[in-house]
Each structure stands twice: as structure tokens, then as C-alpha cells.
């Protein structure tokens, strides 16, 4: 087995019972692939598919003028290079975007020509605004902040059939409805009312009988009835009435007369129910007609107009009910044959027939006018307007788009559905198979007449009791709109606005000799894009607390947003877990608040298909044998198969074992024989999301607690020294690498140079491109602020001389340790009560943990100050500030900006700024002072940037931005100079490395070769030696050597050109950088200068901080106890944390107990390894012990492939504790945990005996740190990976003495952000009332709150030393009086 360079250093012992068939896919693929498909930068202009930008342009262009003689055609588009790179955009607060230019062709036709003739073609490039670019990690930089476009899970376009579940009508009758949802355009609804009449409505407007729509589509009454009904023919004669015998219609009917065979024998007696046997007898008897009573004709509806063949008189119209009078009329006129609609109460209802009777519109035009009046009430219906509106509703590509998905969904639900035998022979089968044959193939992206009729027919058939309604929560009916598609829609809407403006101007294009760029104004496009990325509900400020929160945010799918649900209207069904979520959407990870179930996370292996439906992978099973073939199935496809679980037992050949296997079929769990199984899950963790799959022993946790665990891992603050979890799940490495927090090698090579800021790798010859210099330079991110103010800092994980392969770890980032996600610290935990300090989930923690900086984190705050141009003059950033103490000034440089490295506290000046003050009337004293001391100090006020209250830290960076045309101060200039110097050093280093690498390659290439001549009198035919090369004055002279081998000579020339090119590139890059830095900055209007100060704040763990494990076991630190008072073990080691044992049973998150036991084993194994290393045991003994660890149970590791040195390095990395992986749903069993505990703490070891273990080695004797006595019973002790969450008491607690007031109520503001005070609310008043503390209450409600006069008076009294209270009227009472007056009630106060 091949281990990577990093994996060798610390192999994670996995307890997985099954081989991993499919690697965890790239976790950000959804975002990155979607946007790449939108931009199509990789494809040549002519190879671009009709997706993304290309599709948007194609849908709007060509734009034709109103007169038809000019048109604009789209040729292709190009994206330029972004002006600034990502870090520069973040610093300057601008958007990381590239200019979009489209090649547009203006075609002008000849007006005089008889047929369309091109008169003139003008073509040029048109600037279409800027398109934000995605960063390599799947986010966007918008106005300097990283944002994520969350994917949306919305209802798929298509046709959906449902019923109201009996909720609308009191009788509980099911009212069926259908809805045709397009991607863009009007919604068309069909619905039954309680009287079984069928209505339609457009865009949820007023409902109308559905026959109006059918008439508007061109059908008359007879045609409508012909579509929706089977017919019955009755033959009238003097002997009675007969009808054609249709056997299928007789079943379940009662015989109205005796049914006789040809011999006169009774087959079914009158009044008897006709059974299936009777039908067989009737068919065998060869009867073709049946006698019926004349009364049975009454109430039936005629299928067609009855016309007297002689006179042409219409005796009765289609859909007329047959009455006694009508029968008499038929008799008089000698009608021998009538055709009626076949209707029965059971499965052929009279819905359309009855609806037609309520519809009074005469024909096609009248129906269209009725629809126009409903859509545009109050507007006069002219013939042209009526036609235009009706066509634009569903039949125009400009205003209606069903989309490819919608058409596919529509066809599969209507034309391509499987029909039963009875349906095949009915009107419905004839309609789909004969009348509308081929309609599915020709269906475009607009609706056709056939589509509307087929939808109505399917709804009627549903009401008749045939077929199933759709489940709208099924993932086959919900699709994912990712970032590319969302951006495309915005871009298209912007282009549509451009189109309207262009059409107006196109008529003048020829006369005014305009070019395409004169016609097109790109502002609407860039405004639409800007609005979407800046303020859309789906464009969210990226959660960047730690790498997991980044990855999870990018994998989120939301049902909210434009075109989606709203949290107020979403019911339980939408939020609930659905069987189709299996392997697609995580059933665990979702927010706890009002958004529960509306915001979900993609499962680990889920992906979207071309239509936007979620798919999950399965292994194919053939005849009970599981193959290596993997198919991705969508929720619709999955319903057709029987699927076994990933943990089904297999033999060595991959055959399913056992008589019955647990499977899923159509969302139900069943037991099936192995030969029925068609697919099998690829992995046990396929069901859950990334965050949930990071929880070890998830299978032993209650779902509610697992949900909290998954959510709280995203809030874990990166610690100063990240520590890998001893008990993990094996997916930690994927998260660290895919989040781009940890850096991996792009190409294999040898590490040439390492320092804290960069790593240089000389690429292997076989991976370097021929003739190119192979060097990769990785610049590390140092102390950068994340969106949540946490610290992003990368640390090199390699040494000079290390040999790396592609994909090996180069540097660790925040919250990663040796390329694995490390969100918290491994803590030794005891479950026991301790003096009530762990009551209600409180956490008792050792002082040693805080002193060792285990949970110390660095937070970086950014503070800004701007100098504006005011009416009274420009604000000035300066050191010369009135009334500023010497101590404060010492921290500022001559420009008035704080030094880097200064330690600052609340109230300290960071940037000195003065603002001109309005001239005021001076008192004589002030005039005197001005005359003596000059006038500078008095006409400006101090508006400096000061350190906010409750904050202290170290200044780590300062950035100064100056508007174009304003002279830079010394500090700004020195920042630019140092930046340029650093950049030049970087470039020089790169060039030096390139040079060294190139000349090393040349040396290997030419030493030993024959030369034709060269410098220092190298003769023809002589061999080139290392000594000769070393003796040349400069290495660049090597290029003058003439080689006999022509191929080598060419390669030498290529390297020379490559080096020259690199040098030129470096100079060019330096000039670009210089230009960027020296040009003025784009600042907001009126702003002359902006200074950003970055402050690093060190937050140590303290009482009040929130902490949690990975199983939803959260709590608040109640006390940090001196280490000598903590409970300790027999060997003197104190525990780190004491948790409450009562927090476990009721919460049912037993996973934490198993984690603690396995962590205890990991720690014990680490201690044994540490002892062996200290005793300098041989590598063979270490290898033997590691073999017991890795190859006892679970997944086997190939330790034989490691050298002795690698074994020793592996062992030294396990000193603090072994690394275990317990994959989700395939984790360590109890027996395996016991095995590890026995390996860690062998019974024969005297050290182990001293600890006082119980039989299972899960509990030990602990001693009270204060008294030294042993506790009464043994205590569960172990190691748990514990996290510090981003709810720090420092950020929550604040105190106010005086501060801002609300102007209206005169009461203090609330909240830390407003520096508010505490509210003495209604319930607090009740408490004082209950105690009868009248004076305290009066004081609270008046002088201490909003009694303005009373407050002033109180201050005066205190100053004078008179301790008495003069309470007045609270301002809030005045507000109440005003409120009552505003309602028109006069209220006055009368004084007594």
C-alpha cells in the first residue's frame, strides 16, 4: 500500500470493516464546476455549449428593430484579466472581477430591395460590465469581503398533480389539482371544486371554467367531449332500446333487465350484480348487443349534435341531457341511433360535461376575451391585444420558458407514463397513444395545445381514480440551482433590460451611422449582477470561523430565497426528512431555529446531474455479486431498484451472504433475497454530510444531539496550536485539503527552501515541462483576518530536503494538524460531580489548560478611519491633536498613525484625526487664551480613531489608502516602499532559485557530452567536465558552449530563453505591482484618505466561555480550578476537565462515552510508545508493537513498506496518543475498544495496577486534590476531543455607567453594539411591587431612567450634598400621551 509523505508520519488506525470503494469526492465541486460551466473559459469560442453566459446571450440576441431592417447579432464573448488579485481586492475593499466584452455584429438590411438583402455589416467589441470571478476555494470577493452563493433547492419546472388531503371541504372530500410550473413565465393551475367542476387559473388569479381555456385553444363543445369521454351508442326501435355490449363496462353493474343468450337462457337475472364469471359467460355466448330499459337513457348527455338528416334542423346539441321530451322528439323525427357520453359514478365522472354546462362563452374569440378580462381587468379588449396577450401567456419563447428540465419532467409525467390495460382501452389511452402520438418528441420549451389538454386529461383521470398524485417533497420533484445557474438568470434579466433600450435606438442605427457599442449601454447588466452578488438572499457573508464551516457553507442547499419558500409559510412536510434524502441531503445537519429543515447540507458523495437533480453513487449488483462498477442514480431512478446497505455481509468474492438482505425499495425498508438486489451503497457514511461524518460513534448518538454536534463543530475557534483528534472518523484529511486551508503540492519535487513565509520546491524532472524551469513557490498566508475575525495562519509542514509527491502536504493552516482537521484539543476528562461546579452542564476546567495556552486563540479586528472633505474644510490625519497626553502620543508616528507592534488598550488613540469646528462666539477668557497661545487648537475638534471599550491587543498591520491627486504622508509612502522592497526580494529569490535549478539541470545534461567548441578555448571534440564548468567566470557562459548533440543544443537554447523570459516577466511583474501601489486608491465620494488598523487580540480560556464536544454535549466554563485542587490519578496526573455524568443518560449521546474510552486507549498506547522511545528500544520492537496496534482488527496497514527511520518517525508522532478512525456507521465495536484498552494498559504492568482500574479498564480510582483522599467509587476517565466555541464571554459582556440615550423615550439604548444599559422591564417592576419597595421603584422608573428634569435635579442635589430625590414625570409617559393623542383622543393632565 502506498502512503503519502504526510500519511507515513502519522497513520490513522481505522476500525472500518469494509474497503473504501469510492474515495471522498472533491467537496467544493458543486460550486466550482457550476461556475466554470457558466463562464466556459476553457472552451474555444466556437466550441462553447448553450450554457451559462453563452445561453444568456443566445436567448436575447439577435435583437431586431421594430421595422425589421436592422438587427444586432451576438458573435462571441471574452473575459479579460482582473485588475487586482484576490488579497489586493480584500485589502482595498473592491470586487474580484473580470471585464466582460462581447463581439456584437450590427446587420442593416436594404429597405429598397424586394427580398431581404444585407446592405451593411458593422462589428465591434462591446464592454458588458464586470463579472465576479470565483476564488480557487469556491467563494467570491465582493466589496472586499468573501461571500458564498448558496445553492437553492426549488420546485422543479414541469407538471404536478396533488390533492388537498381533504382539508378544504368539511366533508373531507379530496379536491384534486394540477399545476404547470415553467422555469420562467406564468403558472397555469387546474383545480376541482367541491361540486366536481374543473376550473383553471393563471398566475393565481380568478378561477374560470376549464372549458373556456379549451375553447380559447380552438376546440368546440363536440371536440371537447370527444377528447374526454368514451361513447355509448343506443339503438332505438319499436321493440325497445339496445346498446353495443362492451364487456369491461359491465363489471360491478346491476343488471337492469334479464340478460339472455341467443337460445333465450338467462345468463344474469334482473337485479343481480354482474361478476367477472358472468362477463366471461356473456363473452362466450357471443352477444354483441344488450337490451336496456328506455328509462336508463334519461339523464345521459349527448356526445354530438343530433341533426335531422332531411331538414337539417338541430334536434339536440352536444352535451344536452336526455329528457322525456327529448325522447319524444326523437320518436317523432324517427331518430334510430343516438350517441351519448359513457359516464359512471365509479371511474368515469361527468366533470368536463358538467363544467361545460356552466360555461356560457360562445366560441374561441369569446373565450379569449374572457381570459383577457380576467388578466387585465378594466382594459378594453381589442382583437390585437387579446391575441397578443393569449399568445404571450404560454406560447411565446420571449415570455415563457419551460426549460429542458421542465420539458423532460412534463413528458415523463404525461405522455410517457405507464398505463394500465383498462386505461389503454379508454379515452385516455387513445388520447395519449393515438391523438397525441409524437407530441412528446416535438415538444419545445413553450407549451403546446397538446400539453395543456394532456395535463387536463391526466387530472381528470386522477379524479376518476386512476393513477397517483405527486409527492412535492420527493427529490425527483425538487432540483438544485447552483451558483452558475443563478448568476445566468440575473445576467439574462439584465440583458433583457438592455434589449428594450436597444430596440428603441435600432431604427436610428443606419441614419446616424451608429456602431454596436453606441447602441448598447451595459449599466443594466452590471447593476443586475452587482445587486445579485451584493444583496441577494442567496449571496451570504462566508462563515469562515474554521475550515469546516467554510466547506459546509459552500455545500449548503437552501429552500429559501427568490422563487423559493418563505420560513413563515413552510409547513412540516417540506422541512421533514424524506426517504429520497438518502445519500443526497443530510438528515442530521440543519439549523435549530425557524429555518430547521429549510436549510440543508449535501451528503458527502452527493452531486447534481445535468438537469440539476441530486444523485448519489451505488455499486452495481449482478446476480447477487457486488461489482466494482459505480452508477450515480437520481431520486427518480432510485425508485425503480432494490438497493442493499453498505454494511451488508459479503464473502471473499464479493457475493452477498445470507438468505435475506436488508434493502430499500421505493423508500421502504424490506428484506430481499440476494438475487433481487440490483445496487448497493458505496459507503456507510453516504447518508450524512461532511460535518456529521466528522462525529465518531455517530451511530450511538440521538439525532437531536448529533444535529447540535454537527452545528457546533462549525463554531469551533481555531486554537493557537491545533491538535489532531485522537479519535476521528478518517474524513479529517479530505476536509483540511479540500477547504484549501492546508496547502498541498501541485507537483512532486524536492523541498529546496523553507521559512515561515514560503516554501520552495524544485520539481522532479519527469513532472517538469521540457525546456521550462521547474520550480513551485508556495507563499503562505500569515496572520490574516477571517470574516469572523478568527486568525488564518499557515505553517510549513516540511523541511528542506524532503521529497514530496503531487498532493502531499506542504503547509498546515488554521485548525489543521499534519494535514488533518483539528478543531479542538484532546482533553483528559473525568465524569463526576465536583462541588456543584458542573451543575446544568457547567464545565470545571484545570488552570493548567489555560496556563498551557491549550485553548488560547488569536482574533484579529480591523478598525477603519476615514478623513473626509467637510463643508468647513478637510479633516486631517495628524499627530498634532488638542489635549492629548504624552503617553498617548508616544504610540503615534509623525503622520499620526500607530506603530506596528504597539500594545494598545481601550481608549488609546490609534489614528489621530482632527475635524474643523464651526466658528462659535468666544468668551473673553477664550479670546485671551487664543491671543496668547495662537489659534490652532480651538478651531478643530479631536475625532481620532480610538480603541473600542473592552478591547486590548497588539497592532499587527496598518494600511493607508490615499485618493488620486492627494499627496501621501510619510507613513503611506514607507508602507509602499517596504511592500515594493519585499516584492523585489521575493522576485529576486524566485529568479535565483530558477537560475540554480536551471543550471543544475544543464550540468546534469551536458557533463560528459562532446563539445564543438566554447569559451576558455574549449576545443572541438573535447568532453565537458564539472571542473571545466566550475572554472568559467560566470555560469551564464555555459550557454556559449557549442554541443555536438543537436537535441541537447536545442534544449540548452530553450532553457536560456526560458530564463530570459523569467527575468523579463519578473521585471514586468515588478512594474505592474509598482503601478498598482503608486496609483491613487478608489475611495468613496468625499473621502480623501482611509487608514485600516489591524489588531491581534489574544483570548485565553476563561469562566463564561462556551465549550462543547462533538456529540452535542455543550456547556459553559463555570470555574478554572488551580491544578493542585483538581482530582488526580494514583500516579499524580490531574485530569483536565470534570464533566457532569448526569448530562449523558437523558440526552442519549452515548457516542461521547465510547469516544472517551477509545481516547483513553489512544493516550495509553502513546505513553507506551513514548516509554519505548525513551528506553531507545530497537526499531524491530517498535514495529512489532505497532503491528499489534494497526493489524489486530479493522483495516490492516502495510507497515512492512516503511523503513526503520520512517517507523521511528511514525512512533515519535504517536507519543502523545495514537490516532484512531472510527468511520460513521462502521466504527469500532465494544470488543475492539476493549482490545485497544488491553494493549494500552496490560494487566501485568505494575504502573497499570497502581491506577486502580476496574475489570473493563474504563474506570479508575481518582483522588481529591484538596484532601488527597480517594473518591468513594471509581470514575470514568478518558480522552475527549473538546472544542472552544465562538461564543466568548469577552465578546458578550460589557458594562455601562453613562452612555447614549434614545431621543424619543429618553431611555438608554440596549445591546453591546450600542453601548447600551440594562433594562428594568415589566417583570422586574412586578418583583419590586411584590416586595413593596415603593421608593426603590419610584427611583427606578424616574430619575434612574427617563425623567429628564429629575435626572438633572438629582445630579445637582448630589453635587450640593443634599441627598434627596425630586421625581418628575417619566418621558415614556409623555410618549404614551402623544400616542393616545395621535389616535384622535384628547387627553390632558390635571394637577391636584
From Swiss-Prot:
<keyword id="KW-0240">DNA-directed RNA polymerase</keyword>
<dbReference type="Pfam" id="PF10385">
    <property type="entry name" value="RNA_pol_Rpb2_45"/>
</dbReference>
<keyword id="KW-0808">Transferase</keyword>
<comment type="subunit">
    <text>The RNAP catalytic core consists of 2 alpha, 1 beta, 1 beta' and 1 omega subunit. When a sigma factor is associated with the core the holoenzyme is formed, which can initiate transcription.</text>
</comment>
<dbReference type="Pfam" id="PF04560">
    <property type="entry name" value="RNA_pol_Rpb2_7"/>
</dbReference>
<dbReference type="InterPro" id="IPR007644">
    <property type="entry name" value="RNA_pol_bsu_protrusion"/>
</dbReference>
<dbReference type="InterPro" id="IPR037033">
    <property type="entry name" value="DNA-dir_RNAP_su2_hyb_sf"/>
</dbReference>
<dbReference type="InterPro" id="IPR007642">
    <property type="entry name" value="RNA_pol_Rpb2_2"/>
</dbReference>
<comment type="similarity">
    <text>Belongs to the RNA polymerase beta chain family.</text>
</comment>
<dbReference type="InterPro" id="IPR014724">
    <property type="entry name" value="RNA_pol_RPB2_OB-fold"/>
</dbReference>
<dbReference type="InterPro" id="IPR042107">
    <property type="entry name" value="DNA-dir_RNA_pol_bsu_ext_1_sf"/>
</dbReference>
<dbReference type="InterPro" id="IPR015712">
    <property type="entry name" value="DNA-dir_RNA_pol_su2"/>
</dbReference>
<dbReference type="InterPro" id="IPR037034">
    <property type="entry name" value="RNA_pol_Rpb2_2_sf"/>
</dbReference>
<dbReference type="Pfam" id="PF00562">
    <property type="entry name" value="RNA_pol_Rpb2_6"/>
</dbReference>
<dbReference type="GO" id="GO:0000428">
    <property type="term" value="C:DNA-directed RNA polymerase complex"/>
</dbReference>
<dbReference type="GO" id="GO:0003677">
    <property type="term" value="F:DNA binding"/>
</dbReference>
<dbReference type="Pfam" id="PF04563">
    <property type="entry name" value="RNA_pol_Rpb2_1"/>
</dbReference>
<dbReference type="GO" id="GO:0003899">
    <property type="term" value="F:DNA-directed RNA polymerase activity"/>
</dbReference>
<dbReference type="InterPro" id="IPR007641">
    <property type="entry name" value="RNA_pol_Rpb2_7"/>
</dbReference>
<dbReference type="Pfam" id="PF04561">
    <property type="entry name" value="RNA_pol_Rpb2_2"/>
</dbReference>
<dbReference type="InterPro" id="IPR007645">
    <property type="entry name" value="RNA_pol_Rpb2_3"/>
</dbReference>
<dbReference type="InterPro" id="IPR007120">
    <property type="entry name" value="DNA-dir_RNAP_su2_dom"/>
</dbReference>
<dbReference type="InterPro" id="IPR007121">
    <property type="entry name" value="RNA_pol_bsu_CS"/>
</dbReference>
<dbReference type="InterPro" id="IPR010243">
    <property type="entry name" value="RNA_pol_bsu_bac"/>
</dbReference>
<dbReference type="InterPro" id="IPR019462">
    <property type="entry name" value="DNA-dir_RNA_pol_bsu_external_1"/>
</dbReference>
<keyword id="KW-0548">Nucleotidyltransferase</keyword>
<dbReference type="GO" id="GO:0032549">
    <property type="term" value="F:ribonucleoside binding"/>
</dbReference>
<dbReference type="GO" id="GO:0006351">
    <property type="term" value="P:DNA-templated transcription"/>
</dbReference>
<dbReference type="GO" id="GO:0071281">
    <property type="term" value="P:cellular response to iron ion"/>
</dbReference>
<comment type="function">
    <text>DNA-dependent RNA polymerase catalyzes the transcription of DNA into RNA using the four ribonucleoside triphosphates as substrates.</text>
</comment>
<protein>
    <recommendedName>
        <fullName>DNA-directed RNA polymerase subunit beta</fullName>
        <ecNumber>2.7.7.6</ecNumber>
    </recommendedName>
</protein>
<keyword id="KW-0804">Transcription</keyword>
<dbReference type="Pfam" id="PF04565">
    <property type="entry name" value="RNA_pol_Rpb2_3"/>
</dbReference>
Amino acid at each position: 500500500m502506498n502512503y503519502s509523505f504526510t500519511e507515513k508520519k502519522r497513520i490513522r488506525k481505522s476500525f472500518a470493516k469494509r474497503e473504501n470503494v469510492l474515495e471522498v469526492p472533491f467537496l467544493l465541486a458543486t460550486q466550482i464546476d457550476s461556475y466554470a460551466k457558466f463562464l466556459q473559459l476553457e472552451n474555444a469560442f466556437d466550441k462553447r455549449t448553450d450554457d451559462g453566459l453563452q445561453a444568456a446571450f443566445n436567448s436575447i440576441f439577435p435583437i431586431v428593430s421594430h421595422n425589421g431592417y436592422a438587427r444586432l447579432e451576438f458573435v462571441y464573448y471574452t473575459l479579460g484579466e482582473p485588475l487586482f488579485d484576490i488579497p489586493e481586492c480584500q485589502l482595498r475593499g473592491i470586487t474580484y472581477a473580470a471585464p466582460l466584452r462581447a463581439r456584437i455584429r450590427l446587420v442593416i438590411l436594404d429597405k429598397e430591395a424586394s427580398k431581404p438583402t444585407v446592405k451593411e455589416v458593422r462589428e465591434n467589441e462591446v464592454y458588458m460590465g464586470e463579472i465576479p470571478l470565483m476564488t480557487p476555494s469556491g467563494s467570491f470577493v465582493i466589496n472586499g469581503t468573501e461571500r458564498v452563493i448558496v445553492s437553492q433547492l426549488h420546485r422543479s419546472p414541469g407538471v404536478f398533480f396533488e390533492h388537498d388531503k381533504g382539508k378544504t371541504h368539511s366533508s373531507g372530500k379530496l379536491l384534486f389539482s394540477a399545476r404547470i410550473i415553467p422555469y420562467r413565465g406564468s403558472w397555469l393551475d387546474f383545480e376541482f371544486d367541491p361540486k366536481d367542476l374543473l376550473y383553471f387559473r393563471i398566475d393565481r388569479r380568478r378561477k374560470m371554467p376549464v372549458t373556456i381555456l379549451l375553447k380559447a385553444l380552438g376546440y368546440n363543445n363536440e371536440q371537447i367531449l370527444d377528447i374526454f369521454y368514451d361513447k355509448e351508442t343506443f339503438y332505438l326501435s319499436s321493440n325497445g332500446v339496445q346498446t353495443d355490449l362492451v364487456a369491461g363496462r359491465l363489471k360491478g353493474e346491476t343488471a337492469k333487465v334479464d340478460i339472455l343468450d341467443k337460445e333465450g337462457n338467462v345468463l344474469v337475472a334482473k337485479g343481480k350484480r354482474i361478476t367477472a364469471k358472468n362477463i366471461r359467460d356473456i363473452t362466450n355466448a357471443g352477444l354483441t348487443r344488450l337490451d336496456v330499459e328506455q328509462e336508463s337513457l334519461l339523464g345521459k348527455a349527448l356526445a354530438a349534435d343530433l341533426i335531422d338528416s332531411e331538414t337539417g334542423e338541430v334536434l339536440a346539441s352536444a352535451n344536452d341531457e336526455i329528457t322525456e321530451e327529448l325522447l319524444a322528439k326523437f320518436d317523432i323525427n324517427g331518430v334510430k341511433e343516438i350517441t351519448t357520453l359513457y359516464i359512471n359514478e365509479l371511474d368515469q365522472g361527468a366533470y368536463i360535461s358538467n363544467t361545460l354546462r356552466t360555461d356560457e362563452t360562445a366560441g374561441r374569440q369569446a373565450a379569449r376575451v374572457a381570459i383577457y378580462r380576467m388578466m387585465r381587468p378594466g382594459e378594453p379588449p381589442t382583437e390585437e391585444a387579446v391575441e397578443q396577450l393569449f399568445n404571450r401567456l404560454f406560447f411565446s419563447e420571449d415570455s415563457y420558458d419551460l426549460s429542458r428540465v421542465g420539458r423532460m419532467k412534463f413528458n415523463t409525467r404525461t405522455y410517457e407514463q405507464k398505463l394500465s390495460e383498462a386505461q389503454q382501452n379508454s379515452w385516455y389511452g387513445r388520447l395519449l397513444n393515438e391523438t397525441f402520438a409524437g407530441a412528446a418528441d416535438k415538444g419545445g420549451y413553450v407549451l403546446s395545445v397538446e400539453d395543456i389538454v394532456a395535463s387536463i386529461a391526466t387530472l381528470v383521470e386522477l379524479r376518476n381514480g386512476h393513477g397517483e398524485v405527486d409527492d412535492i417533497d420527493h427529490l425527483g420533484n425538487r432540483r438544485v440551482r447552483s451558483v452558475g445557474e443563478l448568476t445566468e438568470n440575473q445576467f439574462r434579466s439584465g440583458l433583457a433590460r438592455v434589449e428594450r433600450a436597444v430596440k428603441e435606438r435600432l431604427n436610428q442605427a443606419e441614419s446616424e451611422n451608429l456602431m454596436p457599442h453606441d447602441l448598447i449601454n451595459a449599466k443594466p447588466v452590471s447593476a443586475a449582477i452587482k445587486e445579485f452578488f451584493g444583496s441577494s438572499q442567496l449571496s451570504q457573508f462566508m462563515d469562515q470561523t474554521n475550515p469546516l464551516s467554510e466547506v459546509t457553507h459552500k455545500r449548503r442547499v437552501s429552500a429559501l430565497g427568490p422563487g423559493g419558500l418563505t420560513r413563515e409559510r413552510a409547513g412540516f412536510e417540506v422541512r421533514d426528512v424524506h426517504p429520497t434524502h438518502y445519500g443526497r441531503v443530510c438528515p442530521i445537519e440543519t439549523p435549530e431555529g425557524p429555518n430547521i429543515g429549510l436549510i440543508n447540507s449535501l451528503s458527502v458523495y452527493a452531486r447534481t446531474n445535468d438537469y440539476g437533480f441530486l444523485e448519489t453513487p451505488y455499486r452495481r449488483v449482478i446476480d447477487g455479486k457486488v461489482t466494482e462498477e459505480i452508477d450515480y442514480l437520481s431520486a427518480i431512478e432510485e425508485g425503480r431498484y432494490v438497493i442493499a446497505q453498505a454494511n451488508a455481509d459479503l464473502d471473499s468474492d464479493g457475493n452477498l451472504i445470507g438468505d435475506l438482505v436488508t434493502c430499500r425499495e421505493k423508500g421502504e425498508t424490506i428484506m430481499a433475497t440476494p438475487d433481487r438486489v440490483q445496487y448497493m451503497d458505496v459507503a456507510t457514511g453516504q447518508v450524512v454530510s461532511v460535518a456529521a461524518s466528522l462525529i465518531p460513534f455517530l451511530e450511538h448518538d440521538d439525532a437531536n444531539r448529533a444535529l447540535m454536534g454537527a452545528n457546533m463543530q462549525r463554531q469551533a475557534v481555531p486554537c493557537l496550536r491545533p491538535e489532531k483528534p485522537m479519535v476521528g472518523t478518517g474524513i479529517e484529511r479530505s476536509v483540511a485539503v479540500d477547504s484549501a486551508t492546508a496547502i498541498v503540492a501541485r507537483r512532486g519535487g524536492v523541498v529546496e527552501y523553507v521559512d515561515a513565509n514560503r516554501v520552495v520546491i524544485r520539481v522532479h524532472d519527469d513532472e517538469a515541462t521540457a525546456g521550462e524551469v521547474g520550480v513551485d513557490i508556495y507563499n503562505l498566508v500569515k496572520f490574516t483576518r477571517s470574516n469572523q475575525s478568527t486568525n488564518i495562519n499557515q505553517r510549513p509542514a516540511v523541511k528542506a530536503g524532503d521529497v514530496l509527491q503531487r498532493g502531499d502536504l506542504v503547509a498546515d493552516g488554521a485548525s489543521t494538524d499534519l494535514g488533518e482537521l483539528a478543531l479542538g484539543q484532546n482533553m483528559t476528562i473525568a465524569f463526576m460531580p465536583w462541588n456543584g461546579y458542573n451543575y446544568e452542564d457547567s464545565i470545571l476546567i484545570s488552570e493548567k489548560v489555560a496556563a498551557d495556552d491549550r485553548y488560547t486563540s488569536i482574533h484579529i479586528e480591523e478598525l477603519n478611519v476615514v478623513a473626509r472633505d467637510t463643508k468647513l474644510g478637510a479633516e486631517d490625519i495628524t499627530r498634532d491633536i488638542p489635549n492629548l497626553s504624552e503617553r498617548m502620543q508616544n504610540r503615534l508616528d509623525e503622520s499620526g498613525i500607530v506603530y506596528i507592534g504597539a500594545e494598545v488598550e481601550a481608549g488609546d488613540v490609534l489614528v489621530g484625526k482632527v475635524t474643523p469646528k464651526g466658528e462659535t462666539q468666544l468668551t473673553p477668557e477664550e479670546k485671551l487664551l487664543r491671543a496668547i497661545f495662537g489659534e490652532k487648537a480651538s478651531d478643530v475638534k479631536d475625532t481620532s480613531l480610538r480603541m473600542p471599550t473592552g478591547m486590548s491587543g497588539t497592532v499587527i498591520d496598518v494600511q493607508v489608502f490615499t485618493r488620486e491627486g492627494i499627496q501621501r504622508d510619510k507613513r503611506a509612502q514607507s508602507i509602499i516602499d517596504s511592500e515594493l522592497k519585499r516584492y523585489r526580494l521575493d522576485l529576486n529569490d524566485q529568479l535565483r532559485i530558477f537560475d540554480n535549478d536551471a543550471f543544475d539541470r544543464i550540468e546534469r545534461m551536458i557533463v560528459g557530452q562532446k563539445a564543438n567548441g566554447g569559451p576558455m578555448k574549449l576545443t572541438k571534440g573535447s568532453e565537458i567536465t564539472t571542473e571545466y564548468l566550475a572554472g568559467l567566470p560566470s555560469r551564464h557562459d555555459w550557454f556559449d558552449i557549442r554541443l555536438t548533440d543537436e537535441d541537447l543544443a536545442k534544449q540548452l537554447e530553450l532553457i536560456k530563453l526560458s530564463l530570459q523570459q523569467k527575468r523579463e516577466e519578473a521585471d514586468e511583474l515588478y512594474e505592474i505591482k509598482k503601478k498598482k501601489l503608486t496609483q491613487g486608491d478608489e475611495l468613496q465620494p468625499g473621502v480623501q484618505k482611509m487608514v485600516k488598523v489591524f489588531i491581534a487580540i489574544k483570548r485565553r480560556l476563561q469562566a463564561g466561555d462556551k465549550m462543547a464536544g462533538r456529540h452535542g454535549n455543550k456547556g459553559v466554563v463555570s470555574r478554572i480550578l488551580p491544578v493542585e485542587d483538581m482530582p488526580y490519578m494514583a500516579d499524580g496526573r490531574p485530569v483536565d476537565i470534570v464533566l457532569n455524568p448526569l448530562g449523558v443518560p437523558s440526552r442519549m449521546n452515548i457516542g461521547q462515552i465510547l469516544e472517551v474510552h477509545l481516547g483513553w486507549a489512544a493516550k495509553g498506547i502513546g505513553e507506551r510508545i513514548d516509554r519505548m522511545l525513551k528506553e531507545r528500544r530497537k526499531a524491530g520492537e517498535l514495529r512489532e508493537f505497532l503491528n499489534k496496534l494497526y493489524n489486530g482488527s479493522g483495516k490492516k496497514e502495510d507497515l512492512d513498506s516503511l523503513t526503520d527511520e520512517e517507523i521511528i518517525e511514525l512512533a515519535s508522532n504517536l507519543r502523545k496518543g495514537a490516532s484512531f478512525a472510527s468511520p460513521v456507521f462502521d466504527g469500532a465495536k465494544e470488543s475492539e475498544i476493549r482490545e485497544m484498552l488491553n494493549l494500552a494498559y496490560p494487566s501485568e504492568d505494575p504502573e497499570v495496577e497502581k491506577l486502580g482500574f476496574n475489570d473493563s479498564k474504563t474506570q479508575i480510582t481518582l483522588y481529591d486534590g484538596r484532601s488527597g483522599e480517594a473518591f468513594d467509587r471509581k470514575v470514568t476517565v478518558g480522552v475527549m476531543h473538546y472544542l472552544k466555541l465562538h461564543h466568548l464571554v469577552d465578546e458578550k459582556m460589557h458594562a455601562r455607567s453613562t452612555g447614549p440615550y434614545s431621543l424619543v423615550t429618553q431611555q438608554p439604548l440596549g445591546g453591546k453594539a450600542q453601548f447600551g444599559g440594562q433594562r428594568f422591564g415589566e417583570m422586574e417592576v412586578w418583583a419590586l411591587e411584590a416586595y413593596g419597595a415603593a421608593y426603590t421603584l419610584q427611583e427606578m422608573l424616574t430619575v434612574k431612567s427617563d425623567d429628564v428634569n429629575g435626572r438633572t435635579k438629582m445630579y445637582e442635589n448630589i453635587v450640593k450634598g443634599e441627598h434627596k430625590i425630586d421625581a418628575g414625570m417619566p418621558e415614556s409617559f409623555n410618549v404614551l400621551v402623544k400616542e393616545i393623542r395621535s389616535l384622535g383622543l384628547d387627553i390632558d393632565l390635571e394637577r391636584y
